[in-house]
Structures are given as C-alpha cells and as structure tokens.
C-alpha cells in the first residue's frame, strides 16, 4: 500500500483487506515515521491480522500471530525497479489464491519481484515460474525476537 497522502481511506482499506502490505514509504507516512517494527505491531494489534512492509533490497517484514518475520532477499544487480511493487503484490495474491501459506506467499512474491528488478522491459521483465521456483531457494525467512 502506497499511502503518500495519509488519507483516511487507508484505515478502511486496512480494515477490509485480508493481507495489508505497505511500501516502506507508505508505512512511514501512515504511522507518522515510527520505526517499521513498531508500526507493524501497532497495525497488527489494531486488526489482529497479517500486516507486512516491503523494503526493497532489505526484503520484506511482516507480523502475524503476534510474531515478527523477515524474508531476506539476496543481493542482485538492479536494472529497473519500476513496477516491482505491483509484481510483488500480484505474485503474493497469486500464491494466496493457490492456498499457499503467508510465508510461502511472501517467498514467492519476494523472489518474483527481485528477479523482475534484474531486467528492464515492463511486463516482459516478469520472470517465468521455473526461474522463480529455483530462485526461491536463495531466500531466507527468519523469525525475529521483538
């Protein structure tokens, strides 16, 4: 969720979304520049559901079941980041629609978006499933003590 105006609609969207996922800038704007961990837990405590933030090359952080998790992505040569967020959200939704767990969906989305950033060309830079499935093995999920 990119929320650069901090509109009141964002609270309604969060309430109604099954899996709200923010961009780093969107989360900072929405929660008035709190550190991302505190912001995620505040939203989780308000909604009692999964909430995440994408942080580019620093990966993805999320809270579910009152625990903080991190999906670390490998360092890659970035060529183009345009639409990386859209690719992430689309891949995440696709994985959820296939009844994947939240963690599996994060892995799939992070791998897909990371690979997309390694090429230019809009829709033509979205990687093939076989490439994503190999690349997923390079990603790591960690439960963070908080």
Language-model regions: role of each:
Residues 1-41, 59:
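Conserved beta-alpha-beta core of the PfkB/ribokinase-like small-molecule kinase fold
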Residues 36-146:
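Conserved phosphate-binding/catalytic region of the ribokinase-like
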């Amino acid at each position: 969720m990119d929320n650069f105006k901090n509109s009141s609609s964002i609270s309604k969207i969060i309430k109604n979304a099954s899996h709200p996922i923010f961009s780093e800038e969107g989360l900072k704007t929405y929660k008035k520049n709190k550190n991302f961990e505190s912001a995620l837990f505040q939203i989780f405590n308000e909604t009692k559901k999964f909430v995440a933030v994408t942080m580019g090359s620093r990966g993805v952080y999320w809270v579910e079941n009152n625990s903080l998790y991190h999906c670390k992505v490998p360092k890659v040569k970035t060529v183009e980041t345009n639409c990386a967020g859209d690719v992430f959200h689309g891949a995440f939704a696709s994985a959820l629609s296939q009844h994947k767990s939240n963690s599996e969906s994060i892995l799939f989305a992070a791998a897909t978006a990371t690979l997309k950033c390694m090429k230019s060309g809009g829709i033509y830079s979205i990687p093939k499933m076989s490439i994503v499935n190999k690349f997923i093995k390079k990603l790591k999920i960690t439960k963070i003590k908080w």
